[in-house]
Amino acid sequence: KTNSIFLDGYICKTPIYRKTPLGREIADLLLAVNRPYGKSDYIPCICWGRNARFASGFEVGEHVQILGRIQSREYIKKLTETETQKRIAYEVSVSKLECVEE
């Protein structure tokens, strides 16, 4: 059984680089992957460590390829002052990424 994904797409939002309270480096990417008929999928990706440092230099429009796995996590969405809802987010945890020279 395996959970692996390969994506070939374009950075569509400036990467967000930060450090966790424990000092781990992390970068959030949003990748646009083109589909037939002029449609695109927008896939959130998360990078750690060296990959996060590398990804932090990406610019919008840059062509990249990503290898990773799909992961899910639960979070609490605040709907009103008193109301919350448990939700699930899915994202790609990146193990390898590279720029594609056009």
Task: Identify the residue ranges that each predicted region occupies.
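Single-stranded nucleic acid-binding surfaces, predominantly the OB-fold ssDNA-binding core
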Residues: 1-102
